Amino acid sequence: MLTIYSDDHRLHHGRHELIGGQFTPCFEKPSRADMVLDRVKAVGLGEVRAPRDFGLEPIRRVHSEGFVRFLQNAWQDWLATGRSHDMLPIAWPTRRLRQTEPDNIDGRLGYYSFDAGAPITAGTWQAITSSANVALSGQSELANGARSVFSLCRPPGHHAAADYMGGYCFFNNAAIAAQAFLDRGAGRVAILDVDYHHGNGTQDIFYDRADVLFTSIHGDPRFEYPYFLGYADEKGNGVGTGYNFNYPLAAGSDWATWSQALQAAIRQIQAYAADALIVSLGVDTFKEDPISQFRLDSPDYLRMGEAIGKLGLATLFVMEGGYAVEEIGINAVNVLQGFEGVHR
């Protein structure tokens, strides 16, 4: 399987995030992607290739012009205030507040985010545009006839919506790739999000559309981040009704429980008859992940890949979460190897 990867991810390395009421060193760090790449090479998964540059237009097909412009200029605007530490928001436009973009950089930072878990640094812009290009390069390979590609994206993307960032995510790589499939002639695209945390951004982007099916298996939002989307009764809106399927599971869920939700999602994908499948590949479902509470073990990821491979769809794997750094490479590549063992 071809892997698309860029060293530019290392340019984004936030020092702290706000979690559990404390500023904590970021769990989302460069060593995550480095460990996955090392495993890709160690098992001989296939060629590793740098991404092409697709410019900003494919990103603007998903993200608002104001949001893209904010991210492009954020660091320079921050420096202009005399500050050079990482950017984190302090206020958000919640219920009954005006939804008007402020002029002040701190106000804009809150306006375009939903939490304090996506620090912007000097290298963030280059890293996030490269991450989007990693996804777009994988999509392009599939559009040109490849049957499967691994886009080793970092930073991840599935918490980012059209006009907000959060949860380590800035541009929604999976959504950008899905839109690119449609723009190149696909009629229907399915997204399967297997990250422990609900892909709220991806759901938000496609919630009122029928040309993208979104399925997600994740921790119950009554108790788990991101809390405010991911319930089973969220089925889509308008013409998108019936094209959104959430499978929230209790803390402690193991493979026996998790795999039942996977089979339910697979049935929806089969019925949808998609032209392509995008897997938002988070492996923070692992039993030793420091910020998640499922109980999957490393061999379970082989079985996960096999189940996805049996769909027989042209498939793009887009890297999302996974914070047990020593095992992230083993678990992510197990999915890919399990997939390759059965995919035709």
Curated annotation (Swiss-Prot):
SUPFAM superfamilies: Arginase/deacetylase. One of its GO terms (molecular function) is hydrolase activity. Its EC number is 3.5.1.-, 3.5.1.62. Pathway: Amine and polyamine metabolism. The keyword Hydrolase applies. Keywords: Hydrolase, Metal-binding, Zinc. Pfam families: Hist_deacetyl (PF00850). The record marks Y323 as: Polarizes the scissile carbonyl of the substrate. Induction: By exogenous acetylputrescine and agmatine, but not by putrescine. CDD domains: HDAC_classII_APAH. Zn(2+) binds at D195, H197, D284. The active site is at H159 (proton donor/acceptor). Binds 1 zinc ion per subunit. It comes from the Bacteria. InterPro entries: HDAC_PDAC, His_deacetylse, His_deacetylse_dom, His_deacetylse_dom_sf, Ureohydrolase_dom_sf. Disruption phenotype: Cells lacking this gene show a markedly delayed growth with a slight hint of increase after 15 hours using N-acetylcadaverine as sole carbon source, and display an elongated lag-phase of approximately 6 hours before growing on N-acetylputrescine. The deletion mutant strain exhibits only marginal changes in biofilm biomass in comparison to the wild-type. GO terms for biological process: epigenetic regulation of gene expression; polyamine metabolic process. It catalyses: N-acetylputrescine + H2O = putrescine + acetate; N-acetylcadaverine + H2O = cadaverine + acetate. Its cofactor is Zn(2+). Belongs to the histone deacetylase family. Catalyzes the deacetylation of acetylated polyamines such as N-acetylputrescine and N-acetylcadaverine. Plays an important role in the metabolism of acetylated polyamines in P.aeruginosa. Is involved in the degradation pathways of N-acetylputrescine and N-acetylcadaverine, that allow P.aeruginosa to utilize these acetylpolyamines as a carbon source under glucose starvation. Shows nearly no activity against N(1)-acetylspermine and N(1)-acetylspermidine. Can also hydrolyze artificial trifluoroacetylated lysine-derivative, and to a lesser extent, acetylated lysine-derivative. Homodimer. This is Acetylpolyamine amidohydrolase 2.
